[in-house]
Amino acid sequence: GKLCLSEMLFIMVLFHASPYKDFKHFYIHGVEGEYRQLFAEVPCYARFVQTMGRLLLPFALLAHCLRGEATGVYFADSSKLAVCHNRRISSNRVFAGLAKRGKTSMGWFYGFKLHIVINHKAEIMAVRITPGNTDDRKPVPAMAKGLLGKLFADKGYISKTLFDQLWKNGLQLITGIRRTMKNYLLPWLDKILLRKRFIIETVLDTLKSTLGLEHSRHRSPVNAFVHIFSCIVAYGFKTTKPKLNTAIQMWDYP
């Protein structure tokens, strides 16, 4: 059996929207089972996985097309994408030369980082995938290209160089301050929005917990990136997204 490109894309998005946590079980019991009537022909699981690589570019383009609305209020953050358990780092061959050891507040991991920028409606504006040891601030200029307004982030994004670079392009970086730093005055609405950074943590939690973004069963780097981008596309199609207090959205801001 053969599937056209759109059917393969649909299957990947359907997986993220389904209750299945494992793609193999989803394909065998879902695609070849309860959803079988949706497709004229269905190849076996092994054949589908062999041809998944061709979906990478279409999914990357789809993710770009589902980009959120330019609202002037944005949030930036990153999250780890571990590709194996720490005990198996030395034996991992699938991502050799690609994945790197990184560290978060929860400890060390081996894999990649997903960097993300969203607007205040929790719509994804930009994503970047980097090795796990990449500084969170490094991808921000490329991700923020074309964005105007204010970008809220945590203390890990503090950088005068980054602030100046974004400021020249019409985007103000607003972060919390470290204990050793001198306090500075912020407009009250900026202070409120800085405290609302949990919205991007909610988006990352939705990607990981609900849509199954992170797992350690990948057998191919290309298929791993297909999985990541299909997850981002599935999120873009979600009709219900986290929201900030509507009273804040009513302000003509920034």
Where are these regions (language model features)?
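Short alpha-helical elements
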Residues: 1-254
